[in-house]
Swiss-Prot record:
Residues bound to [4Fe-4S] cluster 1: 32, 36, 39
Protein name per UniProt: GTP 3',8-cyclase
Origin organism lineage: Bacteria, Bacillati, Actinomycetota, Actinomycetes, Micrococcales
One of the Pfam families matching this protein, by short name: Fer4_12
Effect of residue 39 to S: Loss of activity
Species of origin: Paenarthrobacter nicotinovorans
Key words of the record: 4Fe-4S, GTP-binding, Iron, Iron-sulfur, Lyase, Metal-binding, Molybdenum cofactor biosynthesis, Nucleotide-binding, Plasmid, S-adenosyl-L-methionine
Quaternary assembly: Monomer.
UniProt binding sites for GTP: 25, 76, 107, 168, 282-284
Binding positions for S-adenosyl-L-methionine per the UniProt entry: 38, 80, 131, 202
Amino acid sequence: MPAARPAGAGVGLVDRYGRRATDMRLSLTDKCNLRCTYCMPAEGLEWLSKQAVMSASEIVRIVGIGVGRLGVRELRLTGGEPLVRHDLVDIIAELRRNHPELPISMTTNGVGLAKKVAPLKAAGLTRINVSLDSLHEETFTKLTRRPFLDQVLAGVDAAWAAGLGPVKLNAVLMRGINDAEAPSLLAWAVERGYELRFIEQMPLDADHGWTRRNMITAAEIRDLLSTDFVLTPDPRARDGAPAERFEVRRRVAGSGAGLGPVLGTVGIIASVTEPFCSDCRRTRITAEGRIMSCLFSREEFDLLVLLRSGASDDDLARRWQDAMWLKPKAHGMDHVGLDAPDFVQPDRSMSAIGG
């Protein structure tokens, strides 16, 4: 068992390896209106009760502690699907009133987004990420088990038009399903000014069917894109970001340099094969108020029970600091590589953690 956080560990959310968490990922709900194959079962998942999930006032208080006392500088709202929460706009508005300069972004599947973009922007949302794995209706429906592609595309366009940019798109490639679509998806994104990020499938599916063999790796993604594009490393500093970014140029046939102008950027998030644990600066709070220092942690620390028992902000801050001090060196274990023989997949799926 790792040693407890020493008294002289300093302020903020620091772990025993010297990393400082400044990026807060907060899940608003475990509920979702899609059933993506790499995240959720087709049927039968039991949602948390309303009482088990943090209320709006509890969310606002926890964020206030993170920002005001513990050095949180960025907030991302996640789910589940945050748009299914009826008080989402009110939550964002209150967070914005309390923290006028805080970047507040949100990850969404985009279903119903077009109708909610204007109030979200007015409330103070800064930026948005939308999950989009395919532009083909049949493939999209196969992956998400719901026929909502048109709604998602409308939401992406509405977010861009409302100024919630840069709009980022997240795509998970599945072998034999949508991997061949990678070049056309990138072409579509850069043409419209969106930043596409390809994400290696992680072992966070509810069915526990993930295998390293079936995953499309970052190296394979680069190879798929190289048929149509030339990728060169983005000169901007990565600064702890999960995505390795590349400038995108169209591959030009014939003599000469063989490069066209820069069309945009693409990101590749290689959590499995090229992990970035040593630079991680994230702290995660689940919808029921539990601290997870890593997506793959099997250990959780309950803030909500403490909060509801009358704990002070100082008490909650100390509990949060103690939890983050125990953050493992890599991937929820003290080794690098999710395909290591002793890796144990967390019980929670991505929807129950918050992406």
